[in-house]
Amino acid sequence: MAARVCCQLDPARDVLCLRPVGAESRGRPVSRPFGPHPSPSSSAVPADHGAHLSLRGLPVCAFSSAGPCALRFTSARRMETTVNADQVLPKVLHKRTLGLSAMSTSDLEAYFKDCLFKDWEDLGEEIRLMIFVLGGCRHKLVCSPAPCNFFHLCLIISCSCPTVHASKLCLGWLWGMDIDPYKEFGASVELLSFLPSDFFPSIRDLLDTASALYREALESPEHCSPHHTALRQAILCWGELMNLATWVGSNLEDPASRELVVSYVNVNMGLKIRQLLWFHISCLTFGRETVLEYLVSFGVWIRTPPAYRPPNAPILSTLPETTVVRRRGRSPRRRTPSPRRRRSESPRRRRSQSRESQC
């Protein structure tokens, strides 16, 4: 599995190197001076590697399980590498990169190729990793000749191998956290996986539904509900993904790679956004308990052999009608009167009619 990336100061070149570090590393302080620049052939670094940087003011979060700190790239937009192969980095990595002003563009290319990924699991020669530097919280590092801005390294890695295993490798190694966006709502990713991918409407239809039903609440500065907040975040994430796909389509020269990245975003990430949008819109429309009950009912139905289940799957819109529990007691008075029954002419009515005829 891929190793984490940590910062390593090279006093000979007065630059910071990004080096892989094992997940067990927590940066225990050591008193030894900084050693020589390790050779590129090393696949990992010791657990206490880079801990000396704490003496120079590097924040503790550089060694936490949440992820290391790294250089803030002011002009970098994309870094690209290939597993087990050399890949020329795009020329957008200019000398303006903080902390690396003394290095040429060619040095930057070799620098990242040698230091960035060294302990990635062998997934094949065709697997490409697209790494986009987004940003994060900043810290100060007091060093000569001037203070440098630092921040958490925040990466989005889109792997061209659309498998669950590859996706976990691409993302799980960065944070090491088990985050389920449905957990606080009583559901889980596994529960949503009961529904097939073609069950969820298109993102355009879901966005139109959210806009038609909850636009005022979504645009409101007030906190309406956790579902409204989650909807806002999902809509914003999809907008950023669309910007990313548009940028890749415009700047990636290789048509095959461009198609792979755009297709991966639309299919894999698009499915996750569709699930999120559907879940929160449905919870706001039908109620969370009804949606959870529907997920369980659908999961039971689809996992039952066809010979032993009803021909039609449960429908969320009709589920509340079959699960309403009415209280005992007098039923409320109906507003619409019942149709009058035709009365037979009784002797009393006949007598009244005879009297009227006499008058």
Swiss-Prot record:
GO biological process assignments: DNA-templated transcription; microtubule-dependent intracellular transport of viral material towards nucleus; symbiont entry into host cell; symbiont-mediated activation of host NF-kappaB cascade; symbiont-mediated arrest of host cell cycle during G2/M transition; viral genome replication; viral penetration into host nucleus
Disulfide bonds: none
Span of the signal peptide: none
Region of interest called Disordered, as start-end residue ranges on this chain: 25-48, 312-359
Bias-annotated ranges (Basic residues): 325-352
Record Pfam families: Hep_core_N, Hepatitis_core, X
GO terms of molecular function: DNA binding; RNA binding; structural molecule activity
InterPro entries: Hepatitis_B_virus_capsid_N, Hepatitis_core, Transactivation_prot_X, Viral_capsid_core_dom_sf_HBV
One GO cellular component term: T=4 icosahedral viral capsid
Top-level taxon of the source organism: Viruses
Cross-referenced HAMAP family: HBV_HBEAG, HBV_X
The protein's name: Putative X-Core fused protein
